[in-house]
Amino acid sequence: MAKHQPDNQAQFRRFENFTELTHTLVSEWMHLIDDASQSKRTAAFALAGGSTPAPIYRELDQALAQRATANVLLTATDERWVHDNDPQSNEGLFKKCLSQSVGKQWHLVSLKNAANTPEVAMEAINERLQKQLPERFCAVLLGMGADGHIASLFPGAPVQADGLDCLAAVHPQTHQTRISLSLPRILQTEKIWLVITGNEKREVFENALSSDLPIGNLLKQAQCQIEVFWCP
């Protein structure tokens, strides 16, 4: 069973393993989707990429596919500037893990276009986000790096650009170009799910409020419910 303990404004939820974590999170996720459906609202979510949340998305896909209809919009919290058939593409990951329900129960609001660089694309992507997404997400699912980064908001780098909902980013080690939701846009949500594993990341999280890391800034500025889903 999950154990609950408060951690400042965040609720820290400990699970014995990732399977248990996944079942709990997907159940909560489907409740949000069903609530939105009953009230005739669009359920919009921003999702982290990477290998860690992939099992969550596969289980969500199975649950969504059992619904006759669902008005769900998904967008990435950040995306590498690669084609969506590239193994490193977050949007490609979503389409693969949520393959049964894509185009039926959910639709993608993409962070990419045909521009050569995210810097060139930013204003057009910002316009797309503002036109196609509701003002607030139902929830944002975030991961966190051991360096305290979230989405593609890295330590010491900007977290917003000219009031836009997105910004160009560069990975500090690989120098790979990316596009990311800005911190203010990430915070426009009813709820944040932070999914982390291992003791190293737990320690980073526990010390975040006394830091200037992106995760620390998120915790300090958030006006919404934050749930941390953690397992060893």
Model-predicted regions and their roles:
Residues M1-F45:
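N-terminal glycine-/serine-/threonine-rich phosphate-binding loop
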Residues A2-Q9, T69-L141:
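Ligand-binding beta-strand-loop-alpha-helix segment within the catalytic cores
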Residues S37, R41-Q62:
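Glycine-rich N-terminal segment of FAD-binding domains in flavoprotein oxidoreductases
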Residues L47-T52, L142-A146, T197:
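Glycine-rich beta-strand-to-loop/alpha-helix junction loops that act as flexible
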Residues E59-A68, G92, P155-G163:
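A glycine- and small-aliphatic-rich helix-loop capping segment at beta-alpha/alpha-beta transitions
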Residues V120-M122, A151-G156, V204-A208:
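A short secondary-structure junction signal
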Residues L142-P184:
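Class I SAM-dependent methyltransferase SAM-binding "motif I" and its flanking Rossmann-like core
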Residues I186-P232:
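C-terminal functional extensions of proteins
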